[in-house]
Amino acid sequence: PKERRKVAKLRLYLDLIDNAHATHGKGILRALSGEADEWGGGFGRDLAFALLDELALVSGNADLAAQVLYTKASNYEWSGEEHAEVLAIEQYELLMERFPDHELALRAEGKIFAAENLQIGMEVPDIVGKDVDGNDLKLSDHRGKVAVINFWGFW
């Protein structure tokens, strides 16, 4: 029974790879990492990441490779494991380095900014703008006071 499960997983892997080549990775990332119930469980994160890396390499598809890096980073980010944030940032930085013009690189940049600047206990970045009456407004002018920031617009 154990060998049959291994063979079944290998067959599933081959089917997933065939599907990935046909669809450029759409839906494959979750399936390999075991997040999609319909696949009957995954391979575990380490093996799934290795398979994703190999898939990105052999496919030659830049979009798929960018998706793999972003998926790995997101998986680390949400895992809650010790040191996972460092691993996530490494993947986001790699994505930005290899695919600087990809839309996921922009998202990665935002994730890194949030991790480095928007955490509990950190000083709030200054916000400069106009109030409803057109007067200059700086968040730093209200340091030490309770402030409510309400963003609104007509879009």
Regions found by a protein language model. Name each.
Residues 1-11, 15-27, 35-46, 55-66, ...:
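Short solvent-exposed coil/turn linkers within tandem alpha-helical repeat scaffolds
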Residues 52:
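Active-site substrate-binding loop specific to GH73 endo-beta-N-acetylglucosaminidase modules
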Residues 69-72, 91:
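TPR/Sel1-like alpha-solenoid repeat signature
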Residues 137-155:
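Short active-site neighborhood of thiol/selenol oxidoreductases, capturing the structured segment around
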